[in-house]
Amino acid sequence: MKPIVKYNVEEPYCSNKIAPFNSQNTFLAREVLPYYAVLPHVGRMDDIWGSYILQYYFPNSVIYNKASVYQDRNVQDLVTNLEKEVIGYRNTYNFINNLQKYMDNLPEEAQHFYKTYMKAYE
């Protein structure tokens, strides 16, 4: 049986600290699109690390609110998920504490992708 996880969020909230967000049910302002990407080659950190990069360029800009849709999650292989999250457990602390050098902390394939992505907005 899958757990049903629901939060009772009544009003939007934010923080002046960097905080993760994922790519699901996320609304982005047009001007931030060049800075946010779901990054390949970083396992399950693809959207989370992308959110940290966005906040490097736009600090104090994230607002959380209740979901506007309900997501019926597909069946997951928890061991595979864990294996794909290890990169985050090992590297996220360093990643967010050295955001001015975020490109150096990405795998080479992710660096190439992000540079190509940014060029599309020049």
Task: Annotate the PLM regions.
Residues 2-122:
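C-terminal catalytic/acceptor-binding lobe
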